[in-house]
């Protein structure tokens, strides 16, 4: 009886927190902590930008001499519906819950059963979405796809035929940062966890006595000698490729990258329910997702030669 009550509790737990859980599912990817997020995108939405220049002129005489320019540009962000469908056999679920309840009784687990299931699935969705934001090419176009398709995006190569020197990769990425990128504010180097750990290990290996050792567990570090440049690891670049060549770093001002979604629309959902006919507990998440880059010419990508 207790297990049956708990299965009902799973649906109740989700029903009471649908909006909160959907937001956590969609917004939990770490890249979204720093890039621009555009909400309420149903299908397509324009990204409108104005680039203005003014000219100072001699005002010692009368007259009108119009000068300067206002350049309007527009890029479209397009989102696609993404779904997660899962199901669990009610009998198997009850067996698992009984074992899990023993762990709770022994103080080896603290979360209620229904919260544990939802929490683990949220983590899995967040991890999958983190990769999709950068690498997706089927359901929607990830950021690397946008970069590869735009001729104005700067794709630079690094010769890894003799192996990857992470110091060289980061230094090359740093050397490619333009004045326009600096003018936007803080510049971010997005790198894979492998590049991040490799670079920190390399820096720590030559660490002098008066410099603190860098903790590889840090969410980000700054480039030595330039606090304007942040180096940030992302699982989204793990195993990433452009044209079958490894991607080592993507450099830009973080808000130049855009993720579009819609977590409040009626077509989006986060739901768990029990199907008595099939004796299955079903799990559904539905949301929109898509990416775009405001100014591709202000993105530098370092990839394998």
Residue spans for each PLM region:
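Sequence/fold signature of self-assembling virion shell proteins
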Residues: 2-55, 60, 149-161, 165, ...
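Non-transmembrane, amphipathic alpha-helical segments
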Residues: 76-78, 113, 281
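Helix N-cap / beta->alpha transition motif
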Residues: 89-100, 190-195, 234, 251-254, ...
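Short loop/turn segments at secondary-structure transitions that flank enzyme active sites
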Residues: 92, 127, 195-197, 289-291
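Acidic/polar, low-complexity extended loops/arms that serve as protein-protein interfaces
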Residues: 23-98, 127
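Short coil/turn segments at secondary-structure boundaries
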Residues: 133-138, 185-192, 212
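Alpha-helical scaffold segments that mediate packing/assembly in large oligomeric complexes
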Residues: 99-176, 302-305
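Ordered core of a single globular domain
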Residues: 168-206
């Amino acid at each position: 009886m207790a297990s049956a009550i708990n299965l009902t509790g799973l649906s109740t737990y989700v029903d009471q927190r649908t909006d909160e859980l959907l937001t956590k599912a969609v917004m939990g990817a770490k890249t979204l902590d720093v890039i621009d997020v555009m909400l309420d995108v149903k299908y397509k939405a324009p990204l409108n930008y104005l680039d203005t220049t003014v000219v100072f002129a001699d005002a010692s005489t009368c007259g009108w001499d119009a000068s300067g320019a206002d350049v309007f540009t527009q890029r479209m962000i397009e989102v696609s519906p993404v779904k997660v469908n899962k199901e669990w056999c009610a009998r198997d679920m009850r067996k698992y819950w009984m074992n899990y309840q023993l762990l709770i009784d022994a103080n080896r687990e603290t979360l209620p059963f229904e919260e544990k299931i939802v929490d683990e699935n949220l983590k899995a969705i967040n991890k999958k979405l983190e990769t999709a934001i950068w690498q997706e090419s089927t359901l929607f176009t990830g950021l690397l796809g946008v970069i590869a398709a735009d001729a104005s995006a700067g794709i630079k190569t690094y010769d890894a035929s003799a192996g990857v020197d992470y110091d060289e990769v980061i230094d090359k990425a740093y050397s490619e940062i333009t004045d326009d990128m600096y003018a936007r504010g803080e510049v971010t180097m997005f790198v894979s966890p492998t590049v991040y750990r490799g670079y920190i290990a390399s820096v720590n290996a030559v660490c002098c006595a008066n410099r603190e050792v860098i903790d590889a567990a840090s969410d980000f570090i700054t480039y030595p000698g330039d606090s304007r440049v942040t180096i940030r690891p992302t699982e989204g670049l793990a195993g990433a490729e452009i044209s079958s060549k490894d991607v080592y770093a993507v450099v830009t001002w973080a808000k130049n990258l855009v993720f579009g979604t819609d977590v409040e629309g009626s077509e989006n959902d986060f739901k768990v329910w029990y199907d008595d006919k099939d004796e299955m507990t079903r799990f559904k998440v539905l949301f929109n997702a898509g990416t775009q880059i405001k100014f591709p010419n202000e993105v530098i990508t370092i990839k394998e030669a």
